[in-house]
């Protein structure tokens, strides 16, 4: 009787040793599984050793504790003179308890190890997790020939085009501008067809493509006419084509534009890129029936839209942006000037949190910076030109002539200029004439037509159909003269506009810069002639600053009006207006 408990104790110890050996093998096997998972997620092997060591240590403690408890109970049973069967039963229960405790400890440690393995990569990439770059990382591979170019050539390209690239995320190797179309990664040579008429990418295209193809958020600050549409269009089409065919259904990209004319222009260029790839593009804007646009949205992959109409379609369920993970805000500064901030916020709220967001702007004021910080994650900022402050500047390739004259002499002087610049071999040269008000535009258009010139008009009183027809005729050269109000002053890419004439000075110097920006596009030179009268003298200081910044001659007659620059005022609230962001949380006040 006295020896039986000892033998049972030995049996129990032997069984525990056998189980321990089995669990150690299991632990090694699971260690390799954990190690493989850690390698997949980028963890160091040291972390694996720590997890395995702590696990074995915990298992050993649990087993020793259970064995000690079993031995103690066996001794107590022996002293009490219990029968063999109950003693064996108690020993078996003790061994069973030991095994259970060991399994419990093992499971606990495995769960902790799995939790550590899954949380570590999230912490390492917490910022990119809100952008498309997290899922698109590594999708762009630099062309071999581009990688082999001497750094001196890249530096010369950046210096020549006065390009500045600011990336808040440190990189082991900086992405090089795609300075030649052959370096652009395409899956099919037919995708290069839209570039057939160009010799090389524009500076904004060359600089932005590497970052956009890598899935990064980006802010592009560049003058109008710099080729921004293809800058965001090429990565847009490529991003959609990279998806499996069964996941391409629905709206995948949305481009927001401030005006109908600019939206149509973007649409035309994107169609040339998207249609050969089998992708559908739709353009939605107000002033036309909604039903055809609703039907088109159901089949569209890319939507180009003005803010108002797009929000209408979202509101009635006709446009679903829940899968639109490529978002472009074009002419962002102008959209804010036009009061579209809230509609923009509503549109972006309908898109996925995990998206790639792009913003193109001619200026970089605080309002645009605030908007970028709200919707973008670590955006790359690319500035073309020496205007690092982001203030509005005129294109230096445009020669600006300012004529100070009597208000009643405008029409006759306009007629002289038309005869001078549109006669003989230049009779088909495109000339854009700007007026301030709709009625003035109609009067000037009729005046020019009566003098025997072919002329069209574009202003707010015309229907969308007539505006589109006039613009198309002007672009195609059927009508070489176009009279417009500021509705056409920005964003329109009208090729080969030789001359811009400002019959009446606009309400702001910013509008003046955008007007004259219709010429001198795509690297070409242009000419702008502006009539300035005593009624405009309040803006003389601002105009003088624009002329000086572009190294243009300032007439003595203009200097007589003074160089004072008046404070920019709100159209409705004057100088008392204050821009307040209502979306920011109020300051919390606590009382003791």
Curated annotation (Swiss-Prot):
The Q motif is unique to and characteristic of the DEAD box family of RNA helicases and controls ATP binding and hydrolysis. Belongs to the DEAD box helicase family. DDX5/DBP2 subfamily. The keyword Membrane does not apply. It holds the Pfam family DEAD. A motif (DEAD box) lies at residues 330-333. This is ATP-dependent RNA helicase DBP3. Residues 19-31, 97-108 have a biased composition (Basic residues). CDD domains: DEADc (cd00268), SF2_C_DEAD (cd18787). Residues 413-562 form the Helicase C-terminal domain. Its EC number is 3.6.4.13. Keywords: ATP-binding, Helicase, Hydrolase, Nucleotide-binding, Nucleus, Ribosome biogenesis, RNA-binding, rRNA processing. Its main location: nucleus. The keyword Nucleus applies. A motif (Q motif) lies at residues 179-206. GO terms for cellular component: nucleolus; preribosome, large subunit precursor. It comes from Phaeosphaeria nodorum (strain SN15 / ATCC MYA-4574 / FGSC 10173) (Glume blotch fungus). Residues 73-82 have a biased composition (Basic and acidic residues). ATP binds at residues 222-229. Gene3D superfamilies: P-loop containing nucleotide triphosphate hydrolases. InterPro entries: DEAD/DEAH_box_helicase_dom (IPR011545), Helicase_ATP-bd (IPR014001), Helicase_C-like (IPR001650), P-loop_NTPase (IPR027417), RNA-helicase_DEAD-box_CS (IPR000629). One of its GO terms (biological process) is endonucleolytic cleavage in ITS1 upstream of 5.8S rRNA from tricistronic rRNA transcript (SSU-rRNA, 5.8S rRNA, LSU-rRNA). Residues 209-382 form the Helicase ATP-binding domain. ATP-dependent RNA helicase required for 60S ribosomal subunit synthesis. Involved in efficient pre-rRNA processing, predominantly at site A3, which is necessary for the normal formation of 25S and 5.8S rRNAs. It comes from the Eukaryota. It catalyses: ATP + H2O = ADP + phosphate + H(+). One of its GO terms (molecular function) is RNA helicase activity.
């Amino acid at each position: 009787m006295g020896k039986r408990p000892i033998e049972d104790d030995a049996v129990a110890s032997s069984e525990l040793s056998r189980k321990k050996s089995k669990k150690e093998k299991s632990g090694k096997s699971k260690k390799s599984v954990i190690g493989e998972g850690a390698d997949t997620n980028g963890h160091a092997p040291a972390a694996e050793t720590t997890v395995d060591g702590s696990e074995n240590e915990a298992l050993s403690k649990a087993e020793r504790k259970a064995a000690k408890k079993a031995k103690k109970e066996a001794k107590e049973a022996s002293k009490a003179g219990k029968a063999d069967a109950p003693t064996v039963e108690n020993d078996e229960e003790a061994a069973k308890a030991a095994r259970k405790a060991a399994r419990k400890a093992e499971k606990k440690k495995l769960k902790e190890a799995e939790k550590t393995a899954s949380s570590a990569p999230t912490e390492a990439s917490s910022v990119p997790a809100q952008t498309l770059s997290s899922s698109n990382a590594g999708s762009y591979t630099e062309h071999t020939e581009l990688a082999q170019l001497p750094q001196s050539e890249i530096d010369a390209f950046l210096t020549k085009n006065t390009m500045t690239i600011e990336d808040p995320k440190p990189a082991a190797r900086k992405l090089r501008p795609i300075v030649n179309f052959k370096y652009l990664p395409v899956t099919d040579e037919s995708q290069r067809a839209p570039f057939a008429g160009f010799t090389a990418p524009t500076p904004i295209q060359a600089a932005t493509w590497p970052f956009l193809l890598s899935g990064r958020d980006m802010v592009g600050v560049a003058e109008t006419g710099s080729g921004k549409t293809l800058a965001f269009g090429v990565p847009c089409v490529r991003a959609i084509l990279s998806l499996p065919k069964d996941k391409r259904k629905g709206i995948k990209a949305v481009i927001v534009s401030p005006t109908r004319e600019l939206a149509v222009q973007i649409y035309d260029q994107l169609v040339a890129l998207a249609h050969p790839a089998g992708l559908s593009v739709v353009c939605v804007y107000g002033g036309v029936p909604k039903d055809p646009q609703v039907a088109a949205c159901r089949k569209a992959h890319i939507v180009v839209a003005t803010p108002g109409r797009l929000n209408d379609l979202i509101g009635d369920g006709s446009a679903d942006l829940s899968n639109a993970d490529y978002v472009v805000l074009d002419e962002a500064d102008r959209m804010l000037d036009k009061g579209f901030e809230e509609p923009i916020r509503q549109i972006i709220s309908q898109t996925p949190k995990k998206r790639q967001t792009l913003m193109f702007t001619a200026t970089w004021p605080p309002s645009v910076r605030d908007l970028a910080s709200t919707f973008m994650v670590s955006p790359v900022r690319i500035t073309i030109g020496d205007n690092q402050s982001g203030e509005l500047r005129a294109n230096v390739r445009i020669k600006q002539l300012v004529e100070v004259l009597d208000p009643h002499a405008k029409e006759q002087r306009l007629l002289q200029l038309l005869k001078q610049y549109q006669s003989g071999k230049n009779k088909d040269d495109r000339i854009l004439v700007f007026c301030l008000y709709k009625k003035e535009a109609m009067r000037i258009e009729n005046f020019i037509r009566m003098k025997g010139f072919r002329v069209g008009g574009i202003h707010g009183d015309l229907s969308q159909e007539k505006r589109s027809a006039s613009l198309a005729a002007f672009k195609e050269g059927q009508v070489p003269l176009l009279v417009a109000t500021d509705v056409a002053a920005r964003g329109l890419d009208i090729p080969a506009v030789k001359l811009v004439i400002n019959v009446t000075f606009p309400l702001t110097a910013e509008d003046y810069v955008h007007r004259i920006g219709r010429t001198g596009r795509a690297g070409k030179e242009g000419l702008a002639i502006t009539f300035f009268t005593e009624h405009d003298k309040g803006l003389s200081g601002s105009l003088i600053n624009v002329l000086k910044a572009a190294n243009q001659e300032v007439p003595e007659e203009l200097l007589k009006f003074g160089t004072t620059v008046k404070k920019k005022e709100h159209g409705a609230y004057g100088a008392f207006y204050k821009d307040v962001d209502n979306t920011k949380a109020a300051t919390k006040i606590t009382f003791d």
